[in-house]
Amino acid sequence: MSNILFGVCIILPVLCIGSGCYFIRQEQKKCDILSIVLISVGLALIAFYTLPNTSDDLQRHFDVMRSYQNHSIMVIFHSGYSLVYLNNLIMYIIAQTNILGLYQAIFTFVGYFYLFKLILMIYDDLKIRNKNILIGMLLFIFCMSFYKTYILAIRNYFCFITGAYYCYALRTERIRVHHFLIVVLLLSLIHPVSLVLVIPLLVDWIKNRKIQFALLVGIFFHYPILKFFLSLCPKDSFVYLKILPYLNGTIQPYNANYMILFM
């Protein structure tokens, strides 16, 4: 049994990622898609066997999924995470299988597939021919972002990557605006930080340059603005109690700034 587990944990991911790097060197379009599927599967297998520390966000997800076991599906509307019902539904379905590692495996596979597909789209649009550069980019992103920045903050990074893919698809006219808005709506039901993805549309829609500038200043300097606004609020108000932990740094700021900077 231990040999089988070793093969699944170590050998199979290495084979998948190695095969993906091999296929991406081929000069065929279908090989590019096959390669990013194989690499994403390899990363998903690693993620499946990743065990979080007790202080990690992923551990909270495991706790929620365990609480969903032996309950009806209606539990997703009054337990778990507020308003992110699509995420709660995914958690509920996985909880019924009792294979909790599927949660990070699925998000890892889909997230990295979109990330690598985005790189391929940009690569093709720029008409770059050297596949070694592409392989280097894929491996660099894996080494820099996989465990500490992706798996441990899996929902917001998944939404960021998927949103970035569809932002680029919208900019290059591969999809229409209403398709993009549907994607943003679905992503916001996984993590509310996805709503910042509509900011580029809002900036484009507002034609007045001064208003555009004021909006962007408000986004990039939202921290001191929120601090000033909070000083005017009663300390027992709902808004004060919700925003204060963010300003104090006691909760994760959901990487909204990185999403805005990217766009």
Go through each PLM region and give its residues:
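Transmembrane-helix signature of polytopic, membrane-embedded enzymes
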Residues: 30-31, 119-142
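Alpha-helical transmembrane segments and terminal signal-anchor/GPI-anchor hydrophobic tails
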Residues: 52-63, 68-71, 196-263
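Membrane-interface alpha helices of multi-pass inner-membrane proteins
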Residues: 178-202
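Membrane-embedded helix bundles of polyisoprenyl
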Residues: 132-153, 157-164
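Transmembrane-helix motifs of polytopic, lipid-linked glycan transferases
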Residues: 106-126
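Transmembrane signal-anchor helices characteristic of membrane glycosylation enzymes that use polyprenol
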Residues: 2-55, 222-224
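Membrane-interface transmembrane helices that cradle and orient dolichyl/undecaprenyl
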Residues: 160-178
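Short hydrophobic/aromatic helix or loop-helix immediately within or flanking a transmembrane segment
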Residues: 59-67, 73-98
